[in-house]
Regions:
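Acidic/polar, solvent-exposed loop/turn segments
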Residues: 1-295
């Protein structure tokens, strides 16, 4: 901007000066769906080897990995872009890391994720930066600050905060800040099969057999399985891939071999001469409190 001032007196004498002001545009961070944050969603239930793999209408569109982007308005300027502590450079409209242009084939991994990995995969000519986030570990949904604080488990498909990466964009005109935030859809246990091979058990017959199949889902750490039958509660403990159930103070027992279960009734119930209705109730509770239950 050139500001030119001219003073002319009554008989035509002139005094004149000019001042030049250079303008520098301030950068802007534009996230989606909100301007201050680029928000993406992943699904805990689809973490390979951990998740339950079950889907609901809320979880169907999402996987363990997701793509996202944010846009920088640089007004043609070069810039330093810092994502989660990793420094990138914009020079002549291209994005670089340590002198190498960032592309899908030369992506940059951003360390520091609490539950997954963030990878920057490139930049478009309009300043849109693309990234991929992959969820690798489950997120404890109990009392999560971003999801109903203090209300316990979130339930299958409820969103909880998994990660956040601060973004700063610096040019000669100033600094803009934003954030990449990642939500994870909570997994839940699945009790897929509970069935018996007998519809009746004769008085004097001790064993009740059947099939029990379940998975605690991604939040398997700290998961609990209980079996309630004829006034007794059996609690399961997993070791070396197998579940062992303890309980039965009346001499009864519950065993699970793979998916085949055997409930051994106490002698007091097999010889009482009465018709009994046996209700077998199984409850699977995952590490952050989600429940699957069948009888």
């Amino acid at each position: 901007i050139i500001l030119k001032v001219t003073v002319t007196d009554g008989d035509g004498d002139i005094a004149q000066q000019s001042v030049t002001v250079n303008t520098v545009a301030v950068p802007l961070f534009e996230g989606a769906p909100s301007g201050g944050s680029s928000v993406v969603t992943t699904d805990e239930g689809n973490i390979p080897g951990m998740g339950s793999g079950t889907e609901t209408p809320a979880t169907q569109p999402f996987g363990a990995a997701t793509d996202g982007s944010f846009r920088m308005q640089l007004h043609g300027a070069d810039a330093t872009v810092t994502i989660g502590g990793t420094e990138l450079k914009v020079e002549n409209g291209k994005l670089y890391h340590n002198g190498v242009e960032v592309t899908a084939d030369a992506a940059v991994s951003v360390p520091g994720g609490a539950h997954g990995t963030l990878t920057v995969t490139g930049m478009d000519a309009d300043g849109t930066v693309h990234y991929t986030y992959t969820l690798t570990t489950p997120v404890d949904a109990t009392g999560n600050a971003s999801n109903r604080p203090g209300e316990g488990d979130a339930g299958r498909g409820e969103a909880v905060r998994a990660d956040a990466f601060d973004v700063s964009i610096t040019t000669t005109g100033g600094t803009a800040t934003g954030q990449i935030t990642v939500d994870a859809l909570d997994d839940a246990p699945v009790l897929s099969t509970l069935d018996t091979t007998q519809t009746t058990v004769a008085d004097g017959e001790a064993a009740l057999t059947g099939t029990l199949s379940f998975t605690p889902g991604a939040d398997a750490e700290g998961a609990q399985v209980t079996v309630e039958v004829e006034g007794q509660t059996f609690t399961g403990t997993k070791a070396n891939g197998e579940w062992t159930f303890t309980g039965g103070s009346d001499g009864s027992s519950f065993q699970l071999n793979g998916t085949a279960f055997t409930y051994t009734r106490p002698a007091s119930n097999t010889t009482d001469g009465r018709n009994d209705t046996i209700i077998l109730k199984v409850t699977v509770t995952d590490g952050d409190g989600d429940i699957a239950q069948q009888s």
